[in-house]
Amino acid sequence: MELWRQCTHWLIQCRVLPPSHRVTWDGAQVCELAQALRDGVLLCQLLNNLLPHAINLREVNLRPQMSQFLCLKNIRTFLSTCYEKFGLKRSELFEAFDLFDVQDFGKVIYTLSALSWTPIAQNKGIMPFPTEESVGDEDIYSGLSDQIDDTVEEDEDLYDCVENEEAEGDEVYEDLMRSEPVPMPPKMTEYDKRCCCLREIQQTEEKYTDTLGSIQQHFMKPLQRFLKPQDVEIIFINIEDLLRVHTHFLKEMKEALANPGASTLYQVFIKYKERFLIYGRYCSQVESASKHLDRVATAREDVQMKLEECSQRANNGRFTLRDLLMVPMQRVLKYHLLLQELVKHTQDAMEKDNLRLALDAMRDLAQCVNEVKRDNETLRQITNFQLSIENLDQSLAHYGRPKIDGELKITSVERRSKMDRYAFLLDKALLICKRRGDTYDLKDFVNLHSFQVRDDSSGERDNKKWTHMFLLIEDQGAQGYELFFKTRELKKKWMEQFEMAISNIYPENATANGHDFQMFSFEETTSCKACQMLLRGTFYQGYRCQRCRAPAHKECLGRVPPCGRHGQDYSGTMKKDKPHRRAQDKKRNELGLPKMEVCQEYYGLPPPPGAIGPFLRLNPGDIVELTKAEAEQNWWEGRNISTNEVGWFPCNRVKPYVHGPPQDLSVHLWYAGPMERAGAESILTNRSDGTFLVRQRVKDAAEFAISIKYNVEVKHIKIMTAEGLYRITEKKAFRGLTELVEFYQQNSLKDCFKSLDTTLQFPFKEPERRAINKPSAGSIKIFGTAKARYDFCARDRSELSLKEGDIVKILNKKGQQGWWRGEIYGRIGWFPSNYVEEDYSEYC
């Protein structure tokens, strides 16, 4: 048996790889084992399985998503622990890049073999390897780096075996809340079940409030005589505030439960949602509190002895203070689950609706708490970046969340030769560094506020590395970079993250209703002005209007009521031109200047002279509405109707626009004439995916819509008509309906709608061409469906945007708390679980 297969068998015995993982299949290749180990997560868990607590998993990034920086950090943690705690020699250890870049996977197997023969590993009773003469497999390791896919999605099942500290805290919580079993009637009615739910809500609240009282009475007060005031504040945070709030909450809960049918219980939860916001502070600091407690107890034996004494008095030594400090976080995440069960067994329609309001409030609170924890992890990641980058004199946390990092090649206006660089991309900045061992030397700091991304595939060669490139261009055209990537897939991954970062800086609807929304970090927990739900996390939780200071989620910007201060002049702040321009746009139709058609492309070279303004990107066929133009001047200003951007361009790149005669659409196989949505759905429901039609809207004969069958559903896309042009997105406009359809027959709709990754394939009047698809062995498992209750706007490419009413296929519930993995229209990603209603048909 090949050595790598023996290694796989050993990893399964160590409970690191699932027994059914694809690396065990008959046709498995060694590259699949390499891919499973590359991020270092399973290797760190391996050491903890062999020697409990060998590695503090708080120091391991459990979801590195193939970030080179985080993966290498995990791998180096594994290697240093092998040396320090398992006694491996330096010569027995592989180098970090031997695994991450798969430069020498044979050495990785050799290290794992040496680990399997250590006394610690053998004490687990697991047979080391090799135990038999292995087939020579040195040849299969060569060329592995070319087979590894840097863009592969995480295999969620792989991480089932990774310890979860939250689950550990959950066990303490469940133990504390456990009640004596109550005799149940042999056949329970819905009323009986509802009574059980109400009883559980009250009993667990009583026990939780007692637990808070015990922490204060048996730990906090006795330790005040041993610890400095600042130590007490760090360790116990705002426990006393939590106790006060829950004492009142329990009193009002009991009063509500005493009413017939507990009909006012929902009001208590809604009322206390705002008071429970103090959990934001507690949950953001509890991890630091636990670490500080450990440090103090380790440094002072008298404190350690006092902690043991306190634990004995409080609960006979069953739970330590460290255990109990995790309970508040667990409790606040349980309210929505308790209410969800109560809603399920409530029959009265009005009571059910009222309880749903309480359920929404507690779901929102739980999601807010989960995002605080998630952001704490993100801030740790940013701190690791910060400490590893030399010559960096500003805080990276001011530039948003990390999006992607890794190696690339780069050219700039100053240096045309390709340079090897390492880049870190955040929401608002790109850091270009030179790697020096484990550290990075900052070479350039690019503020993305003034840059745009443009694809350039002209020099790409499929089988040639580092030919896949896109441009990063400054708005003024004075500075720019060419970024080169090893593979087309990596280029696509980076480009998507750049586009997501820029959309976070300049989101759609940022200037809707007279507002001026910008990304913002709120110091206090804040609710969205549009949907009233909480803004999530600890930094850059959402957007704030620079004028009226209204807070909002990214997905809610278009629904915020009109700005209360839209009449004020804020022209002193220069901003990137984006859709929905305000004062300038209102004047443009009053100027009486003609429209022009672009006859030659222009991308900023040569740049506009002096400092007259930004350049305007032009593509042949675009229509430009002039805003400043004099016949004797070589440079004109205009608005590109296709993109809504405003800027300057050479006048010789355009010609007068001539509006053509109306098109005869009936000759096209895709044109259906006047038709409602229902008619389109009846035609397309039983057709193949990709079948489409264009219909005239019955209510307004001047408007059209595309209906397309995609992923078993019929989707409808409104075609907007204005200024003689047709468009389905503000990014691109067409002179005619035929041109629009022809374009999207060749180009995917996902550029307009991220979840609609298809072209317009089959006109509905064509004969059906149905292919028989056999289910593949690796087809995706689905754990049910859910209906989106609200819009959700993804912040990076790992997340899944939702529109209210979307039906989501649930693929996984094992992500970070509060996040599920799902699929819509072929697009897969993570979304907040409180934004959907699972098994919604039962409650609708």
UniProtKB/Swiss-Prot annotation:
SH2 domain location, by residue? 670-764
Identify the InterPro entries for this entry. Answer: CAMSAP-like_CH_dom (IPR022613), CH_dom (IPR001715), CH_dom_sf (IPR036872), DBL_dom_sf (IPR035899), DH_dom (IPR000219), GDS_CDC24_CS (IPR001331), PE/DAG-bd (IPR002219), PH-like_dom_sf (IPR011993)
Q: Which residues form the Calponin-homology (CH) domain?
A: 1-119
Isomerase among keywords: no
| Gene Ontology terms, MF aspect | guanyl-nucleotide exchange factor activity; phosphorylation-dependent protein binding; phosphotyrosine residue binding; zinc ion binding
Query: SH3 domain: from which residue to which, for each copy?
Result: 591-659, 781-841
Which GO BP terms sit in this record? Answer: cell migration; G protein-coupled receptor signaling pathway; immune response-regulating cell surface receptor signaling pathway; integrin-mediated signaling pathway; natural killer cell activation; natural killer cell mediated cytotoxicity; neutrophil chemotaxis; phagocytosis
**Domain PH: residue ranges:** 401-503
Supply the alphabetized keyword list.
Guanine-nucleotide releasing factor, Metal-binding, Phosphoprotein, Proto-oncogene, Repeat, SH2 domain, SH3 domain, Zinc, Zinc-finger
Processing after translation: Phosphorylated by FYN. Phosphorylated on tyrosine residues by HCK in response to IFNG and bacterial lipopolysaccharide (LPS).
Zinc fingers, Phorbol-ester/DAG-type class: 514-563
The record ties this protein, via Gene3D superfamilies, to:
3.30.60.20, Calponin-like domain, Dbl homology (DH) domain, Pleckstrin-homology domain (PH domain)/Phosphotyrosine-binding domain (PTB), SH2 domain, SH3 Domains
Stretches assigned to the DH domain: 193-372
Q: Which Pfam families match?
A: C1_1, CAMSAP_CH, RhoGEF, SH2, SH3_1, SOS1_NGEF_PH
SUPFAM superfamilies membership? Calponin-homology domain, CH-domain, DBL homology domain (DH-domain), PH domain-like, SH2 domain, SH3-domain
> Which domain of life does the UniProt lineage start with?
Eukaryota
Assembly, in brief, is: Interacts with SHB. Interacts with APS, DOCK2, GRB2, GRB3, DOCK2, SLA, TEC and ZNF655/VIK. Interacts with SIAH2; without leading to its degradation. Associates with BLNK, PLCG1, GRB2 and NCK1 in a B-cell antigen receptor-dependent fashion. Interacts with CBLB; which inhibits tyrosine phosphorylation and down-regulates activity. May interact with CCPG1. Interacts with CLNK. Interacts with THEMIS2. Interacts with NEK3 and this interaction is prolactin-dependent. Interacts with ITK. Interacts with PTK2B/PYK2. Interacts with HCK. Interacts with PTK2B/PYK2. Interacts (via SH2 domain) with SYK.
Instruction: Give additional notes from the record.
Output: 'Vav' stands for the sixth letter of the Hebrew alphabet.
So what does this one do?
A: Couples tyrosine kinase signals with the activation of the Rho/Rac GTPases, thus leading to cell differentiation and/or proliferation.
This protein is called Proto-oncogene vav
Which species? Answer: Bos taurus
Taxon lineage = Eukaryota, Metazoa, Chordata, Craniata, Vertebrata
